[in-house]
Amino acid sequence: MLGTHFPPPPLGPSEGRAAPCTFQIPDGSYRCLALEAEESSSEDGLQGEVRLVDLEEEGTSKSRVNHGTPPLSRAPAIIQPSSCCREARGGFQHSDKPSREWDVVQARKVMTASVSSSPVPRVAQKPALGRSTSFTEKDLKEAKERSQRIAAQLTTPPSSNSRGVQLFNRRRQRVNEFTLESRGQRSPKLSQEALQTGHPSSPIGHAPGLSVNPTSPSKPGSPKHSSSQSPSRGVPGHIMEGYSEEASLLRHLEKVASEEEEVPLVVYLKENAALLTANGLHLSQNRETQQSSPNPPETEEVPSPAADINQNPSSPNATLTTAASNSHHNQPTADVNQNPPATITPVQQNSSETQCSPNGTLDSKPNTPSADDGQRPVPAEEVRSSILLIDKVSAPPSAASPFSREATPLSSSGPPAADLMSSSLLIGMQPSTLVASAEQEVSGHAAVTTPTKVYSEVHLTLAKPASVVNRTARPFGMQSPGTTSQIEQSPMMGRRHFGEKAWAPPASSMADRSPQPQRHIMARSPMVERRLVGQRSPVVERRPLGNFTPPPTYAETLSTAPVASQVRSPPSYSTLYPSSDPKPPHLKGQVVPANKTGILEESMARRGSRKSMFTFVEKPKVTPNPDLLDLVQTADEKRRQRDQGEVGMEDEPFALGAEASNFQQEPIARDRSGPAAAEETVPEWASCLKSPRIQAKPKPKPNQNLSEASGKGAELYARRQSRMEKYVIESSGHAELARCPSPTMSLPSSWKYTTNAPGGFRVASLSPARTPPASLYHGYLPENGVLRPEPTKQQPHQMRPSLYALSPVKEPAKISSRATSSRASSRTVSPRAASPAKPSSLDLVPNLPRAGLPPSPALPRPSRSSPGLYNAPVQDSLQPTAVSPTYSSDISPVSPSRAWSPRAKQAPRPSFSTRNAGIEAQVWKPSFCFK
């Protein structure tokens, strides 16, 4: 076999990647475990041979691992030729020795698969290619030597942990060494295995011939199943016979190593968990190997159920592995290859049918697992070895039945379907990959196109160790259905086969859930395969009976119309989830890649339906916009001023300058009201100013806020006010005084009110009214005087800007609350009469204070505003004093206005405590009513 397999080392470059020799070393020890289990069953000679064969098979399985084909399938091919082929030749009625050989081979295979699976990522290293070359050049003797070396190395490491590490490194090296060789060996062994274990599943049965065809490129020496199988059988027989002596020594060494390494195996698996996970198939195979090789007797016991179960799916494989191995090792080229090439639809339909006949155990073996079990207690182990393959294959047989049903669409691609099947064998797990590809075809790939794809990609898989690369790429790409999906699917399917032993019951439920599991739809075959693998336990019987049929139904998606529609829809849907239809194969063979891509895509899809990450309702701001309040209040003031009549205000803004022009209307009302009647004008004044501004805002801030109220804004106000004073105020002394304190004092609510105040400044009558308040607030007079002119100049602009929105709002609110009393007092009382009525005097005062000075007296003014009110009306009569009265009047009115908290409340402006006190608001109310 090695000689036969060595010719294809040209494929070895890619195959070499797949075949890890390093893994073979632990595999030997693992085989020792299997051999130990079989030694108990007195299979030492055969096991030695099998072990030697397994070493070869390790290379083959490693190359298969690189191909993405489960190494397990190859090992059975090698071992089956000796035992299973003998069983096939001798019928299912071989003694337990062949079956135990199968167990040994299976355990070894599984371990080999797991060992080789771990280093698959490392296969690329290929450090000791010279060894692999020498190995290919050298005979089985060198393989014996290597087996001995491996056994010695396995036993040599002092500590289990260090052994695990050393074994891992050695396996890496050996994998790299045997990469080329393993690939050369892989195809014939794979084809043998496919013929033996693979043929039971007609996809594998088909695959062997085609597998040999793709294998023939890799290995022209083994172009056909029978040719490669018979040489392989002969070689394994010779190998096992020739090495039986050394194999016993190796067995003892491997026993020691395996005993020593049974823990290291676990440690190794743990250490190599990442690699095993990366090669999920091998990880699951390792688990199976650990399960089957530690439990080969259990597996034998389970094979009765597992033979039932696995032989339901797998015993067709097993029976086909034996009988079909006989018929398909002998027939495979004619039966499998002929059927698929001749008519993939008939053969695949005959896959379900022929495989129902050879696999007749397949369809009939769910019904006749017992017969197969009776016949296949030996194949049961073959079923184990073929469980990986046959479970994988049996899912394809189920897939093969659907695949044959699919074969109807695939029939047009008859040879390509055979290629798919061959790629299934090539990939080793690709019966399920074929099922995946068949389901891909079912999903939406053109039946012909997908098989052709699969065939080409299968060749690529064989030619390339790209299976590993495809594995890496496939989870992401997943678009290339044939190559990567099959390759990845086969390992992934192996994962599912092995990992989904628990899946077996879910598999049937999955069959029921088939429409729901979109990925599982395509994963049905893998799930069936998983179930088969998992159902080596009696659970598997349920699955072949229930789930085994549903997977064909899933695979039958093409054949069975309703199932086809269901399966087609979900595969198409799952195809939508993956980049392309290959995803359903990924669902089968590439569970992890499919999950990866599917998770991302599903998460994306879910995200679409989900609320955006930042879906939070922003609570609307309840606070009124100062600008809006100012606008509203200003409009109200303007309307009131207009009602009062805009007189003399036009001249004032020009004197004040462009700044004052903004507030012309308010000053006009104030001016007009001032000259007409200081008392009434001031109340009207206040009403205009207060109703819009004070009412809108509650009393927020005192004069202190006004004084504190601005940085640059206050400075700008002060400067503007000083300028305004220069133009508007005749008395420079007051202007200067106002200029100094005004920046802070004028900034508060008085500023906006200063908008109205400019009229007071502009009109002498207003200024006299302001003058008495100034006298009242002597402490604030300079500040108020300073603030007044500044408000007159600066407030007009910035009072209406939202800078001082609080004061306008405050004034309107206060105006409304105090309007009635203020109106009555201001109306009925003359400026002096209003002096006893603080509201009226405040009205007179606020007119001017708004104009300029409310800020300075703001806080103190509320208390002083009452006397200021009395003084304010008196000075209202003194209105003739224009400049200084204006400032003083501004001061006093501002103080009342500040006593009215509304202006102070009007945000930055509420500088006047008099307004905060609410004095002005009261006065304004009368003035408003006076309107």
From Swiss-Prot:
Phosphothreonine occurs at: 549, 771
What is the reported tissue distribution? Expressed at high levels in brain and at moderate, but still significant levels in the heart, skeletal muscle, lung and kidney. In brain, expressed in the cerebral cortex, hippocampus, olfactory bulb and striatum.
Q: Which GO BP terms sit in this record? A: positive regulation of actin filament bundle assembly; postsynaptic modulation of chemical synaptic transmission; regulation of long-term neuronal synaptic plasticity; regulation of postsynaptic cytosolic calcium ion concentration; spine apparatus assembly; visual learning
Where primarily located?
A: cytoplasm
**Short sequence motif PPxY motif: positions:** 551-554, 570-573
GO MF annotation list: actin binding
What induces this protein's gene, according to its Swiss-Prot or TrEMBL record?
Answer: Depends on the long term potentiation (LTP) and the activation of NMDA receptor signaling.
State the residue spans of region: Disordered: 56-78, 113-243, 280-420, 542-591, 691-711, 775-918
Give the stretches traversing the membrane. none
Tell me the residues on which Omega-N-methylarginine occurs: 850
Modification(s) after translation = O-glycosylated.
**Which domain of life does the UniProt lineage start with?**
Eukaryota
Q: Which UniProt keywords apply?
A: Actin-binding, Cell junction, Cell projection, Cytoplasm, Cytoskeleton, Glycoprotein, Methylation, Phosphoprotein, Synapse, Tight junction
Its Gene Ontology cellular component terms are: actin cytoskeleton; bicellular tight junction; cell periphery; cytosol; glutamatergic synapse; nucleus; perikaryon; plasma membrane
**What subcellular locations does the record give?**
Cytoplasm, Cytoskeleton; Cell junction, Tight junction; Perikaryon; Cell projection, Dendritic spine
Where along the chain is composition biased (Polar residues)? 153-164, 188-200, 282-293, 309-370, 556-568, 874-895
Basic and acidic residues composition-biased segments: 136-148, 373-384
Point to the regions of Low complexity compositional bias. Answer: 214-232, 569-580, 816-841
Q: Which residues carry this modification: Phosphoserine?
A: 134, 202, 222, 258, 490, 514, 569, 691, 742, 746, 767, 835, 856
State whether it acts alone or in a complex, and with which partners, per the record: Interacts with BAIAP1. Interacts with actin. Interacts (via PPxY motifs) with WWC1 (via WW domains).
What is the annotated role of this protein in its UniProt record? Actin-associated protein that may play a role in modulating actin-based shape and motility of dendritic spines and renal podocyte foot processes. Seems to be essential for the formation of spine apparatuses in spines of telencephalic neurons, which is involved in synaptic plasticity.
So what family is this one in? Belongs to the synaptopodin family.
Q: What is this protein called?
A: Synaptopodin
Task: Record the organism.
Answer: Rattus norvegicus
